[in-house]
Amino acid sequence: MTITPQHLIALLPLLIVGLTVVVVMLSIAWRRNHFLNATLSVIGLNAALVSLWFVGQAGAMDVTPLMRVDGFAMLYTGLVLLASLATCTFAYPWLEGYNDNQEEFYLLVLIASLGGILLANANHLATLFLGIELISLPLFGLIGYAFRQKRSLEASIKYTILSAAASSFLLFGMALVYAQSGNLSFEALGKSLGDGMLHEPLLLAGFGLMIVGPGFKLSLVPFHLWTPDVYQGAPAPVSTFLATASKIAIFGVVMRLFLYAPVGDSEAVRVVLGIIAFASIIFGNLMALSQTNIKRLLGYSSISHLGYLLVALIALQSGEMSMEAVGVYLAGYLFSSLGAFGVVSLMSSPFRGPDADSLYSYRGLFWHRPVLAAVMTVMMLSLAGIPMTLGFIGKFYVLAVGVQASLWWLVAAVVVGSAIGLYYYLRVAVSLYLHAPQQPGRDAPTNWQYSAGGIVVLISALLVLVLGVWPQPLISLVQLATPLM
């Protein structure tokens, strides 16, 4: 296949981030300079984000048999790049107090974001596997970056071992699918399934095993056991990336697979996914009730949020509204998570041992950091799905597609799960306004709102509120990505 200039334009985000990886690597080899390498990383990610405009002008196309660039890919590439940018921004002040090598952090984030972009453009099971591995391998190092802390190292080892096992299941499942269908391309798989192969035992077994890989990365029950420990043990900026970019990219590629290859047409697959969604929603919310560590709480709540998204995925065959629901929900989840983890990062900067992740550390925050407390309140309300926030719009969409597809038991699970979630999110919000403890703990810098991380947190809060009241710009953007499939 001949690569034309149009193909190169379509691959601009991937090429720019790849070039940035090389430049940062050479910069580290030449001279260690934290500010220089952080700046190069942010410039590269911003350039990749701007290049999406040129990609849009080029139109949808199959760049290679492995990759398709279209509106869908652009939307998810943009979300991954935004999450990566926020991670680098939150990491800079955190790393200022870090005594070991600082620069490699940005290199690992860039490589992981490269994997996320690859997943957003994936059109083949080989690309899916490569993308998942490319996003996972740097996370092994990022999670254990504060390696002098026992819980960070423990979290990294847990994630590494379990991730390797999940990847093995994914690869074995792909082998079974290939053995039955003779194809790994999403479109070719769609044709094979359309020819009546969907009920072949080998194919069903293959897809069943393949669920384990993405299910692990998305923290879905019963593949969720790593989530609370890793969220708690990982540095706050890494938890930001883990909760946003990683999950958005992987959910995006799973949805594209379901669009091309109508796996959801199989009643057996739908029942299995329905049980996973139901269990994730209920279990995630119930376990979050008793948490006193904010990062663990957000870890358990992420299990339930991915359960909500799975409802929209199951309803995908019922209409295009499911794609719209997933896009809007993921955007709301991205900005809400960036804000919540951003506050934790600001409270934990610079690196001074364990993060400020205990709920007690935030007690009475309003009385000395009122704006930061207001931002955290907005994020908790959005994650809870309270009206006038972007989280409510996303949750409303999920309920609407659930009703449209007559998934009544899952709709009931979403309603019950949201009611349970309201309690623990409000518990965090209320603690911000209680009387401050006699001995103050960790605190954000006095001028936090003027730092790059503070600006990202404030913009996230503003977007959550503005798009919660006036969601039409976001809905229009997501709708633009839908017809190009």
UniProtKB/Swiss-Prot annotation:
Keywords: Cell inner membrane, Cell membrane, Membrane, NAD, Quinone, Translocase, Transmembrane, Transmembrane helix, Transport, Ubiquinone. The keyword NAD applies. NDH-1 shuttles electrons from NADH, via FMN and iron-sulfur (Fe-S) centers, to quinones in the respiratory chain. The immediate electron acceptor for the enzyme in this species is believed to be ubiquinone. Couples the redox reaction to proton translocation (for every two electrons transferred, four hydrogen ions are translocated across the cytoplasmic membrane), and thus conserves the redox energy in a proton gradient. It comes from Salmonella paratyphi A (strain ATCC 9150 / SARB42). One of its GO terms (cellular component) is plasma membrane. The chain crosses the membrane at residues 8-28, 35-55, 71-91, 105-125, 127-147, 159-179, 203-223, 235-255, 271-291, 297-317, 326-346, 373-393, 408-430, 455-475. It is found in: Cell inner membrane. Pfam families: Proton_antipo_M. The lineage of its organism: Bacteria, Pseudomonadati, Pseudomonadota, Gammaproteobacteria, Enterobacterales. NDH-1 is composed of 13 different subunits. Subunits NuoA, H, J, K, L, M, N constitute the membrane sector of the complex. This is NADH-quinone oxidoreductase subunit N. Its EC number is 7.1.1.-. NCBIfam families: NDH_I_N, PRK05777.1-1. InterPro entries: NADH-Q_OxRdtase_suN/2 (IPR010096), ND/Mrp_TM (IPR001750). It comes from the Bacteria. It catalyses: a quinone + NADH + 5 H(+)(in) = a quinol + NAD(+) + 4 H(+)(out). It is a multi-pass membrane protein. Belongs to the complex I subunit 2 family.
